[in-house]
């Protein structure tokens, strides 16, 4: 399978990395919500090797993420998990960091509300949340 490619992910990864280095300096286990192509995960898991970078997305995006993961061969990037904010099943694990990029502005408002309502289920105490994207 060809790896999906997002030009914007390539352009914004370095500036985001600078923020993540500070925000996740003392973190170990990060959940990325809406991993999309998987490009960010591959880049950040290499740039921040102290983090276990858990990708998640809707089922239809998982093959592309798996393709990037297979290409990158990162030991700190486990198999991506299915996560749809509208579905009742969320990860049972707790994460001390959550990251999402370019998701909230494409979600329906009800989905954004659902995301923030459900986040406490996966956040460890004192966890960090980093959201990147355009806002109105």
Question: What are these model-predicted stretches?
Answer:
Residues 1-25:
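Class I SAM-dependent methyltransferase Rossmann-like catalytic core
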Residues 27-36:
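Conserved class I S-adenosyl-L-methionine
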Residues 31, 42-88:
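Class I SAM-dependent methyltransferase SAM/SAH-binding core
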Residues 90-98:
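A short acidic, Gly/Pro-enriched loop at the edge of an enzyme's catalytic core
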Residues 100-103, 109-112:
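A short beta-strand submotif of the Rossmann-like class I SAM-dependent methyltransferase core
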Residues 113-125:
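A short glycine-rich, Lys/Arg-flanked "PGG" loop and its adjoining helix->strand segment in the class I
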Residues 126-134:
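Conserved beta-strand signature within the Rossmann-like core of class I S-adenosyl-L-methionine
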């Amino acid at each position: 399978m060809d790896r999906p490619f997002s030009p914007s992910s390539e352009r914004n990864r370095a500036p985001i990395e600078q923020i993540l280095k500070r925000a996740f300096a003392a973190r170990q286990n990060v959940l990325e919500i809406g991993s999309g192509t998987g490009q960010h995960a591959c880049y950040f898991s290499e740039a921040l090797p102290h983090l276990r970078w858990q990708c998640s997305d809707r089922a239809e995006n998982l093959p592309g993420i798996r393709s990037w993961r297979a290409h990158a061969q990162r030991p700190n990037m486990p198999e991506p998990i299915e996560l749809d904010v509208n579905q009742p099943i969320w990860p049972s694990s707790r994460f001390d960091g959550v990251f999402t990029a370019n998701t909230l502005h494409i979600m329906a408002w009800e989905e954004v509300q659902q995301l923030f309502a459900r986040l406490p289920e996966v956040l460890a105490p004192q966890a960090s949340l980093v959201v990147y994207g355009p806002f109105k």
